[in-house]
């Protein structure tokens, strides 16, 4: 009687220790994922060999990869991602693992990023992104949108893509766009316009040319600026601009 009891105690303790070690390993993996991600986006890694070694050691997906960025609807709610980082990371990773997709998921104070391979078709990608958005909304109790990057041939391009994704969410906010998710390519025109608008000389020229229009619009409530904005958002298509203004 004593032997089976002792055996059960030892097995129970061993199981607890193994489970504890497993949990510690999972936590360390998450920390290492975050460290590597921020080393890449801050350009602390400059050699392809180092990027290849470190991503392989953490079992990140092989290149080429795609990055999906998730952002909460309003900046004032961005702190929720930090508060629920562990829950968010596990939930997004679980969605990808359920579809047998190798992944790395990193949550920052501003956004949640999912790195994955590019072998899946558009239909499955649509399902996965919508599942990610829905799960993020459930966890944070806040509306969410997503941007899907272009395929990256190597991890050293992560820094540039990260900046483009941040610009994409900034454009969505300032232009009051309503998409739930979008491909980064579709924001190329808006991103170019954003960069042009930051140029001091261009900014002064626009103020000089549009200054009188702004004054006239305010004085007579002609909604000329709203019409101009609709034209810009619809890539100068009068038909689409008219439809958006009518629906608005």
Task: Name every feature range the model reports, one short phrase each.
Residues 6-248:
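Cytosolic nucleotide-utilizing catalytic cores of signal-transduction proteins
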């Amino acid at each position: 009687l004593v032997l089976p009891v002792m055996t059960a105690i030892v097995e129970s303790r061993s199981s607890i220790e193994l489970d504890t070690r497993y949990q510690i390993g999972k936590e360390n993996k998450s920390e290492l994922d975050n460290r590597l991600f921020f080393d890449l986006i801050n350009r602390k890694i400059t050699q392809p060999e180092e990027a290849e070694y470190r991503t392989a050691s953490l079992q990140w997906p092989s290149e080429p990869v795609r990055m999906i960025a998730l952002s909460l609807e309003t900046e004032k709610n961005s702190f929720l991602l930090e508060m629920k980082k562990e829950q968010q990371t596990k939930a997004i990773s679980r969605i990808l693992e359920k579809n047998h997709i190798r992944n790395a998921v990193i949550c920052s104070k501003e956004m949640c990023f999912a790195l994955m391979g590019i072998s899946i078709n558009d239909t499955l990608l649509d399902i996965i992104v919508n599942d990610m958005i829905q799960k993020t909304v459930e966890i944070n109790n806040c509306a969410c949108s997503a941007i899907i990057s272009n395929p990256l041939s190597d991890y050293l391009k992560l820094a540039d893509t990260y900046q483009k994704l941040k610009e994409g969410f900034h454009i969505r906010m300032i232009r009051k766009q309503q998409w739930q998710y979008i491909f980064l390519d579709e924001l190329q025109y808006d991103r170019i316009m954003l960069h042009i608008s930051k140029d001091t000389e261009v900014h002064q020229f626009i103020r000089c040319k549009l200054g009188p229009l702004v004054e006239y619009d305010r004085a007579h409530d002609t909604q000329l600026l709203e019409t101009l904005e609709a034209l810009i958002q619809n890539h100068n298509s009068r038909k689409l601009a008219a439809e958006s203004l009518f629906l608005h």
